[in-house]
Amino acid sequence: MNSINYAIIGFGGIARNHALAAYDANLRHNLPYSLNLSYIVTRKPIEISVPGITNVTNLQTVLEDPNLDFISICTPNESHVDIVEQAIAYGKPIYCEKPLASTLLDAEKMNKLVHENNVINGVAFIYRFLPAIALLKEELEKKTIGSIIDFKIKTYHNSYLNKEKQGTWRTLKTSGGGALLDLGSHLIDLIHYTLGNIKEIQYQSRIHFKDRSEVDEITRGEILLDNGTLGSVEASRVFAEEIQTDQMILFGTTGSMKLDLTNPYIIQIHDFNTGSTLYKAVPEKHPSMRFYPKERNSLGFFQNCHTAAIIDFANKLNGMKDTIGADFTDGLKCQEVISKLK
């Protein structure tokens, strides 16, 4: 396969990260194929100044193109299921922005469709591609801090303090949820990916700006994993700090591990027995750095992760077996946990 051609469905903010990923991938990584953005599908025509990209307003036109290898869904949550149904009819592989859907019922339907029709699928849970997460998983396997007593993972964003967010699609009930679905879904996937499946969760949730949002702005969840480990997750869209909080902390019987999700090259390991703290950096030759740039070449952790995630999905299409990206089954697992928020 000399080229992998894809179409982005929708062209809001997150779609631009999916688009930039193709150019970043081709310019900075020695791929066995060229990753090409061929189409951008929008409801109304837009001007595209980049050569080689065609803007269309009819999804079927794109799906009928035999040279199209996959679609990337970047539309509001409630529209995902309809787009997946259309793509399935043409057998097109599907890469979908998180969350998988706006409702558990839609997520179940989407997962069933791709499996019944043997369609390759992926979900953009991009935090999996942070090199520090790969390092954390290795340290967990080595039991560097003993058995896990507790964990805390949280993300505090401030964007919905902006009054202009009132009435935007992510503030409406039709989106399926607020801070937990939008931000917390990344965290829930990280818990599943690094620590194990969530067995039980109890939520506390609130809306502070009731005139602006119909969905949760702050949500905390107390968690019990299948293996008996306790922990918590917290997501907010209305917490302002000098430096944004995106943090994961694990407390073990012989110490702790901490990482800042926005600083993807280092984990902090504290040893209770010696009282020492090690700041362990990800080696430049580490497997997790294969499609992730060195710190001096970073475009920011968010874009870096999007690029790595789309390369991973393209690699799956190209027949590679060592991919780590989330799929619709993983997306459904997250949706099941989120759906327990009433």
Where is each model-derived feature located?
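N-terminal Rossmann-like dinucleotide-binding module
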Residues: 1-51
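Predominantly a Rossmann-like dinucleotide-binding segment in NAD(P)-dependent oxidoreductases
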Residues: 127-213
